[in-house]
A protein has these predicted regions:
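Conserved N-terminal entry element of GNAT/NAT acetyltransferase domains
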Residues: 2-24
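Active-site rim helix/loop that mediates acceptor-substrate recognition in acyltransferases
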Residues: 9, 41-60
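Helix-loop element at the rim of GNAT/NAT acetyltransferase active sites that forms part
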Residues: 31-43
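A conserved beta-turn-beta hairpin within the catalytic core of GNAT-like acetyltransferases
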Residues: 79-89, 99, 146
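Conserved acetyl-CoA-binding loop-helix of GNAT-fold acetyltransferases
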Residues: 94, 100-113, 140
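Conserved GNAT acetyl-CoA-binding A-motif
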Residues: 115-127
């Protein structure tokens, strides 16, 4: 239920939780969310989602409304390298109908807490410059833009 207060603010419950099983609502959500994130990527298959869930290094986090509807998702990867434990955030997307409500912030803060609990020294992410709101959110949370280059090698 949404309660409207004076000033036009909506109050609603959002739960952030790790995904523990592939469900129809999860696959349906990815069919809607992935095109909002990338026009060049296809939604993951049930098998791909299952491999992520079973992975020791990756976790899918979702933001659910009070009715269990999935409003957003992200992937957190935590990994050990010779210089310590690191974490990486990928594929952060909040449904366009739910943006501006702090859901992206809640997802990121949950991921940061999980990374901290796992002993990560740092958490990195990338964001296209055109995603102005997302970039501002990351700065507001405390991410610092690094002076580095990101390179990609593609097998496709």
């Amino acid at each position: 239920m949404t309660i409207r207060l004076k000033g036009g603010y909506d109050i609603f419950m959002v739960t952030i939780r790790p995904v523990t099983e592939v469900t129809k609502s999860l696959t349906d959500a990815y069919r809607v969310l992935i095109p909002q994130l990338s026009s060049s990527s296809n939604p993951p298959t049930e098998e791909a989602l299952q491999r992520i869930i079973e992975s020791d290094s990756a976790q899918i986090l979702i933001a659910e409304d009070e009715n269990g509807g999935i409003l957003g998702t992200m992937t957190l990867i935590i990994f050990q390298i010779p210089t310590g434990i690191r974490a990486w955030i990928e594929d952060v997307v909040v449904d366009s109908s739910a943006r501006g409500r702090g859901i992206g912030k809640k997802l990121n803060l949950a991921a940061l807490e999980l990374a901290k609990q796992a002993g990560a020294k740092t958490v990195d992410l990338t964001s296209r410059p055109a995603r102005k709101e997302a970039n501002q959110l990351y700065k507001d949370i405390g991410f610092i833009q690094r002076e580095t280059n990101v390179y990609r090698f593609s097998f496709e």
